Regions:
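Membrane-embedded alpha-helical bundles that constitute the cytochrome b-like, heme-associated redox core
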Residues: 1-237
Length: 237
């Protein structure tokens, strides 16, 4: 298998097999988690802070009831939704662990995602923002641009771990094994609120990600995530 950065016939090898597998498996897992999570939310669409929250407590946010077409299962079935959620949560968690270990071993983090000293200079960030506003997403060598690095770092090292840890906190079985998690997040209801906020952040990330894929050229972007090869600008057919 070629190394990332290898050039051939106007294309650059961009994604290793481990990255591509994780991307598509994770995409399925996240969709199932979000849709089953909406069913779970429908059971009590109110969010609280602290250890307790019930019908007569003051909620900081009241959520809408989500329609059947947006939920798994499509009909209201809380027990089945929890089974779907729990099963794919393990796929999600172990998939993230596998990806992180592989990315550390093969240099993906260091080469493509890690932020250097020059990356955090405000002028560089502003230049990257202006390039995005002009719909110019190209970078030398076909690598990730600065906004991608920042976003992927926040998602991989903040958003996804928070989703997993707060999800574990909401599991009564895990409370017996890891009772300190409840105190870490300031109570079960606080963990539930943080979990929902992070899930909303994940949904927003996916929406923006899909829009940018379309704007950057969906055929080339999707092909690179299937085959690993990304056609550079000026060589596209």
């Amino acid at each position: 298998m070629p190394s990332p950065g290898t050039e051939r016939d106007g294309k650059i090898f961009r994604h290793r097999l481990s990255t591509r597998l994780w991307h598509w498996i994770n995409a399925v897992a996240v969709i199932v988690l979000l849709m089953s999570g909406l069913t779970i939310s429908n059971a009590h669409p109110r969010l609280y802070w602290g250890h307790y929250g019930a019908n007569f407590d003051a909620a900081w946010l009241t959520l809408p009831r989500f329609p059947g077409w947006a939920t798994i299962p499509t009909g209201y079935n809380l027990a089945l939704a929890r089974e779907w959620h729990f099963a794919f949560a393990w796929v999600f968690a172990f998939g993230l662990l596998f990806f992180m270990l592989r990315a550390l071993m093969n240099g993906h983090f260091r080469r493509d995602i890690a932020l250097g000293v020059k990356d955090v200079v405000p002028s560089h960030l502003w230049q990257d923002v202006k390039r995005h506003l002009r719909l110019n997403f190209e970078t030398p060598g076909g690598g990730y641009n600065l906004l991608q690095k920042i976003t992927y770092s926040l998602v991989l090292f903040v958003l996804l771990p928070l989703l997993i840890l707060t999800g574990l906190t909401l599991s009564p079985g895990m409370n017996a094994v890891l009772p300190w998690l409840i105190d870490l997040f300031g109570g079960r209801q606080s963990a539930r609120s943080i979990h929902f906020i992070c899930a909303g952040g994940m949904a927003l990330f996916i929406a923006v990600h899909l829009v940018l894929v379309v704007l950057a050229g969906p055929i080339n972007e999707v092909r690179s995530m299937i085959t690993g090869w990304f056609r550079v600008k000026g060589e596209q057919s």
